[in-house]
Amino acid sequence: MKSLVIVFVVLLGVAMISANEEELLAILQDQRNDARGGCVNKYKRNICGTLVTPMNCIAPRTRMGKFARRFCKFMCGFC
């Protein structure tokens, strides 16, 4: 009886994964067709936007400016 329950649980899991595969492929296709072309901030909002501000993007010789231009491209408008 235990093995029958295990088989049903496994079959249910496989059915759920295969049903979601089509949705995942649609989401992946939408991300590939995104107009930004993959240009995103490489760090979360707590760094790109709070700690590093858009004013840092135009600072030519500072460490924060170099960091912003390299890792916060979407925030700086380099896309």
Swiss-Prot record:
Signal peptide region: 1-19
Domain of life: Eukaryota
Molecular function as annotated in GO: toxin activity
Protein keywords: Nematocyst, Secreted, Signal, Toxin
Protein known as: U-actitoxin-Avd8b
Family of the protein in this entry: Belongs to the sea anemone 8 toxin family.
Positions of the propeptide removed during maturation: 20-36
This protein's GO CC annotations: extracellular region; nematocyst
Cysteine disulfide partners in this protein: none
Subcellular location: Secreted; Nematocyst
